[in-house]
Structure formats: structure tokens, C-alpha cells
Amino acid sequence: MKSPAPAHMWNLVLFLPSLLAVLPTTTAEKNGIDIYSLTVDSRVSSRFAHTVVTSRVVNRADAVQEATFQVELPRKAFITNFSMIIDGVTYPGVVKEKAEAQKQYSAAVGRGESAGIVKTTGRQTEKFEVSVNVAPGSKITFELIYQELLQRRLGMYELLLKVRPQQLVKHLQMDIYIFEPQGISILETESTFMTPELANALTTSQNKTKAHIRFKPTLSQQQKSQSEQDTVLNGDFIVRYDVNRSDSGGSIQIEEGYFVHHFAPENLPTMSKNVIFVIDKSGSMSGKKIQQTREALVKILKDLSPQDQFNLIEFSGEANQWKQSLVQATEENLNKAVNYASRIRAHGGTNINNAVLLAVELLDRSNQAELLPSKSVSLIILLTDGDPTVGETNPTIIQNNVREAINGQYSLFCLGFGFDVNYPFLEKMALDNGGLARRIYEDSDSALQLQDFYHEVANPLLSSVAFEYPSDAVEEVTRYKFQHHFKGSEMVVAGKLQDQGPDVLLAKVSGQMHMQNITFQTEASVAQQEKEFKSPKYIFHNFMERLWALLTIQQQLEQRISASGAELEALEAQVLNLSLKYNFVTPLTHMVVTKPEGQEQFQVAEKPVEVGDGMQRLPLAAQAHPFRPPVRGSKLMTVLKGSRSQIPRLGDAVRASRQYIPPGFPGPPGPPGFPAPPGPPGFPAPPGPPLASGSDFSLQPSYERMLSLPSVAAQYPADPHLVVTEKSKESTIPEESPNPDHPQVPTITLPLPGSSVDQLCVDILHSEKPMKLFVDPSQGLEVTGKYENTGFSWLEVTIQKPHLQVHATPERLVVTRGRKNTEYKWKKTLFSVLPGLKMTMNMMGLLQLSGPDKVTIGLLSLDDPQRGLMLLLNDTQHFSNNVKGELGQFYRDIVWEPPVEPDNTKRTVKVQGVDYLATRELKLSYQEGFPGAEISCWTVEI
């Protein structure tokens, strides 16, 4: 047989909680493997996502080439089908019981074949990989199908695609169809690779219950330039949405004899919390970890409600409490707690047992003394980065101690910081005690991850929630009791309708809320609901049954973590039966992929599970070097076909050091820190529907469907009195070149609509405190910043509708949408379409916020941290007459006096009763980005 040419890999990675697709490949001209068609079809119905990825490749080389197909999945997504079509012959993947598949796997390994499918994990992801040799001129079609129930987090559902084909693809198309009978309340898209040309390939259509998003770029739109054959498709494509909700008992949807019940009441008062933060300050937390923990804890403390009670416990070898009992979240107590948290230093061992038991003891004492408010929610939030090393170190004994101490009274949430944390230990301890575990990835955004987790549990609305259905109507119902419901999340119950059940399904949801018990009721007509799901365009039929099966499997796998003996055996038998019946790859099943004769005959896909060292377990023949989870937007590691050598796993030595960094991976990047801005006074309720509903459903460009923003009423203090001095020749503003005649860069250039002057430039001489630069209640806009020496050390833009905040430093951008924080790096392309607002960033580092009838705000990073940031403005004619602020005042009825003779380079400008001296000068303007342009403007100083 002819030997294959050097291995070539093309990757397709998809992730959906999200839906993520990464498509790295090399060009056909260099390697012969050409992707001539790539399609992604994702259909979301009732939060259940069914994704089909189809890729067609051809070998245009004169020799055999190897193509490798990779798919990266979220942990909670299940592969349900995979096939390869080679020369008209279909080679399917077959789901089998784990033991049966293992026999074929072992036999293949015995023949010297690399039968395992290589998997590594990123942030909550798993990788699926299949390789196959492709003869010259031959074509091959790969098709992968996987399914997932999207979870609502911080008020939104999210689908994410990473697109990186690394070559031009003749037919590239992504279609996302969403059907939500409740009605789509908000729809957003975001991309990190979109150019103005590619934006024309994106279309979005939406009516009351349906949305269709299509991305279909031509070859020319994919090109970096006319002279280059490289593609610009290299980044993320994200869709976020939410649905309409009523104050009733939720929404019941029925299809083909199965039902799903979604319940997420929003307009309820928040229950008071009793929360204890248990913070690991052992030696392994030193450096960046403890710095980010302090930063996050300070911001979390400031988010506590006055009705909450709290305390802090820091632990290393010993556990120390901040106060002897829980204290009210008054301004005075919060300031003291912030001061205490800011001084936490890392040293010593890790005594998890004593720390958590001390937290339980504090709650018990307050409970016995009747100091905890009636119908309040008690939470313990544990943050640690490793195994227990001091005191009780046996994980099982610690879990038993904690479970017995809590005894169902409180909820424990465990946050595992870093790659080597014993996550299964924390997960079991949390699930045993009515909470959940979350891994915090060690990266530049770790503090944001901590804040986002807290925001998920910050607003409890209900506790002791129970769903109830008539016994003659339903059977085989999934979990129907929940300890808590938090604002921004959703409870989901699914089940099967009985054959001779009633025509109307009744449901009752009961729970405890602030100061009282409450019961919700809802009903659904079986016939009417069945009719809703007859549309063939948006629905993959029989999806409700698969939704029920998937949710049942996920919940039983979660129960399996805490089960033992006969209960464990029964759960595993149920999971196995459902997995085989519905063709799901789960921890108890494998998918066996066969190949053409003459190649490796078998590859086996299995669902990875976390083991005691926190790493994902891989097939023995497929273990690879440790994988450092990528930051969103960074390029995933490429694993070549020839690199499947077995590398020892990280073991006890790694965990003992607790500061180990795998060879070849630098420590997490990031600035040494950035000034913390003052928090905003608060945010309004979530915005309403972003797009007009109607009967028309034609495809229209996304940017054409943005709506203007309504007025936002607000009260702001009067403008401060500003003192103007004549411009000094020893200006502290740096020059662009050593040439003293070169134009200087002003702090900000203010385009004045309809003004007879050229332009107005404003230099800020000194600012000890953050400045309110613009406050425009009618625009729903506020811009604040801190000016230091030669530039802004930080700038913050707050927009009321849609609710958005951008906090910028020279090192990074943090965008807060609702309660979710997302980090972006400068000079990474960004294109985000929100209701009534567009947010874009180009490769030069110019971020712009724009919208119909809105002032365009630009933020520009000047590369040099000492020079800071620049604030740019356009479309200033949209400022209202109510605009205020240090710079906003220049847009309110200013009066220019005639220039002063004899050289006409000085004049007076009157602003709000104050005279300013303006000097005519040449300046370097970055209004249009780099490299800047020389302008003549009248300069004033404040």
C-alpha cells in the first residue's frame, strides 16, 4: 500500500452552551486537503439545541493525505451521531456499552493501532477526534450531530461558534434557527472576526416566536485582501437570547406525547441572604491568585444588599473568622470588610475541614439565637485551589463531616481555583449540600469568573420549590424539587404524558418567598401545544422526547456522584439503557468509529470524566500532555496526527507543589492590576424586546433592525466650576516625536455640531479624582474616567438601554451586559449587535459604541500604558440639551467671542457663565484611529 504523505490535520471544533465551532485548517495549495463545503445547522426549540456539522473535503494532492476531524463539545452536550462518507460508502459511528466497546478498543491496541480518540478539555469542553487517510482525488464527507439543553445563566441563553477554517471555503454557511413559543424577548449577536465586508454576509430575521441568523460569506468577503488568499475568519460568533415570561406558573410545551415545563419568575422580591465567604489563603494561592481573589471579593462585598447578613473566614493551616457572628451589610460594615479583605495574604497549608465546619458553626449559632431572618437563604461559598493538606485530609471524611454538620439546613457552593484542584471532591461536597461546584480557570479574567458566579446566586427569589402534576396525567417526570431559584436562572421539568391522560395538563408550583409562601398555577392544552410544533422549517421532530431523555441522563449522572451500593447500580443501569436507546455518548457508553479497510479499523469516543487530580481522564492510548484552557478568542492547540505519544500525567508531585506550570506554557498573562473605578449607583431593570415583532419574516441585515433608544430619566448634580488657565509651553502631554514642532495630542477633541469654529480641543491639566466627563439622561449615557499625567488610566462608559457598561484600561476591556462580565483584549476584532446599539473594535484598537440617534463613543488604546487611553466622539449632534459633565458642558449653548487681534490665535469662549481662554493650535487627532491626522483647533484647558 502506498505510504501516506506527511500528516495533515484540519480541525472542526464546536461548542454549544453555548455552541462553539473552531475550524482550523491549512490551505489546499500547501497540503492538498481542501474544504470545499462547510455548513453548521443549529436548531433550538424550547432551549433544546440540535446541531449538525457537515464538512466536505477533497484531496487535491498527488499523494495520500490524512485528514483529522475534531469537534469540541461542552461537558453537558451529548454526541448522538457521527458518520464519514468515503467514495460513496458510509462509515457510521456506533454507540455501544462501554465494556463491549472496550473489547474492540483493546484488540485494536493489541494490533498496534492507536484506537483512542484524542480528547483534551478547555473551559467546560471535551474534544472528539477522528482521522482518516484520503486518496488523491477522493472526497470525504464528515457529519456530526450533538444535542444539548441550553442553560439560562445571568438572564440569557448563549450559543457560541468559533470559526477558524484557515483557508478560503467556497461554500461556507452557518444557520441558527430559534423557535420559542413563549416569544423571544431579546436577541443579540457578537463576532470577534467580523469586518465591514463580512457584516454584509450576516442576516438576522425575527418575529414574535422565531429567529433565523445566517452567515454566508463569499470567497471575496473571506479574503484578508485582494492580493492575499488567507481568510479573515478567525474568531468567535455568538448568539444570545432570552424569552418572554409571565408571572404565572411558567410555560408548558408539549410535543409527541412528552412535555417540558420551564419556570423562571423574575418579578419577585429578592430574599435576604446569610452568606459566609470561606477563602483559602494557603501558600499555593500566593501571587496572581490571591490578588484576583481580593479584587473579586472587594467587588462582591460591595454588591451585598443592606438586608443581607455576612461574614468572612480566611483559612490556611487554621481558620480565622472576621467577626464573631454574622453582621448586617451596612455601609460601615461593608467598608470594614473591604479593608479586611484587601489585606488577606497567602501563606501556610490548607485546612478545608475546619474552615467549612467553622462556617456551619457560625450559621448554627445565629440560627439558635434567632438572628437569621425568617425565610432567608443561608449560603456558604468556599473558594480553594487544591487538596486539604492540614488537619483532616481524607476527602471522604471531610465530605461526611460537612454533610452531617449542614444537615440540609444551608447550601454549600464550592469554587475550585486552577487546573490542579481536586474538583470531584468539591463537586460531591457541594451536591451533597444543596449547592453546586464551579471551576475557576486561572487566567487574566479569574476575578471576573468569581464575580459572575456570585451574581448567579446573589438574588434568591424562591426556596423549597416543588412542581406538582395530576397523577393521572404524567409519568417518568425528571427532578421536580429544587432547593432554591435564583434570579437569572431557570428551573426545567420534563416528563411523559400518560396515554389516556386529560386534554389539559395542569401544573402547580409552590415555594417559599420573601416573608410568605406562594403557589403558582398554569395549564396547557395538549392539542393546541402539539399544533405549535408542526413547523418543519424550525423544528426537528420528536425533540421533546430526546430533551426528556437527555435531562434525565444528566440528572441521574449528577445523582450518581453521591450514590453508592444498590442505588449506584440502579442509576447506572438507567443511564445505560437510556444512552443506548437514544444513541447518546455518555460516561457509560462509547462510540466506535470504523474506517476503510487498510487503515486503523477502530477509534473509540468516550465521555471523559474528572478524576481525583482534577484532570480529565483520557483513553490510555490517547493521553496527551496537559492542556491549558484557552482564553476565549485565543487559538486552540493543534494536535498533529503523529504526536500521539503517551506522556505521563500530572500526579502527586504536581499537586504537592501547587504552583506547577506545565513546560511550554507560560503563566497566565495579564496586567499587574488596574485601578478600581467607583461602582455605578445601580442598573435599571433588564431591557424589553429589542426588535419589533410582526408577521413579516424576511431576511434583513442585522444592523438595519436596530432600534433607537428611548429617553432615560435621571438626576445628576450641577456642573462643577471649572478654572481655565493659559496653556503652558511645558505641557505634560507627550509629543508624537522628538521634534518640538510636531503637533501634540490633546486629551480630547470635541466635534461641535453646526459650529463656525474648526474644532474644539480640551486638555485636562490635573485630576485627583475620577471625573464625570459626560452625563446625558436623555441619551441614557454616562462617561467617567480618571486622568493621570498624560492620559486616562481608565474610562468607563455606561449605557442605560440596552443595559451595558464598558470599563477600559490600557491592558484590557471589561464589558458588563446585565450581570455578566466579559473580558476583551485590545486590537482584537469585535462586532456586536445589541438592541439599539452596535459595539465594534478594529485591529488598531479603536472600540466604538454607536446606534441610531445616538452619540458615537470611541475608546482608543495608545499602546503605551503611560499614555493611557483616548476618548473620541462622533455624531455629537445627538447630545440633548440636558447633557452635563466636565466635557458635556461644552455642548450646552456655548458662545464664542471674536478672535483677539493682531494674530487672531486667542479668543474667549463662554460656557455656562464661565469664560475660557481658547488658543488656536495644531494638534494630532485620532478621531479616525491610527496613524492620526493633523488638525487646527481651538484649545482650552480644564
From Swiss-Prot:
It is found in: Secreted. Residues 658-698, 726-745 are annotated as: Disordered. SUPFAM superfamilies: vWA-like. Disulfide bonds join 761-937. Highly expressed in liver. Weak expression in lung and heart. Pfam families: ITI_HC_C, VIT, VWA. Gene3D superfamilies: von Willebrand factor, type A domain. Residues 29-148 form the VIT domain. GO terms for biological process: acute-phase response; hyaluronan metabolic process; response to cytokine. Residues 1-28 form the signal peptide. Residues 274-457 form the VWFA domain. GO terms for molecular function: serine-type endopeptidase inhibitor activity. Keywords: Acute phase, Coiled coil, Disulfide bond, Glycoprotein, Protease inhibitor, Secreted, Serine protease inhibitor, Signal. GO terms for cellular component: collagen-containing extracellular matrix; cytoplasm; extracellular space; plasma membrane. Glycans are attached at residues 81, 517, 577, 732, 874. Residues 552-586 form a coiled coil. Residues 663-690 have a biased composition (Pro residues). May be O-glycosylated. N-glycosylated. Interacts (via C-terminus) with DNAJC1 (via SANT 2 domain). Belongs to the ITIH family. Type II acute-phase protein (APP) involved in inflammatory responses to trauma. May also play a role in liver development or regeneration. This is Inter alpha-trypsin inhibitor, heavy chain 4. It comes from Mus musculus. The gene is Itih4.
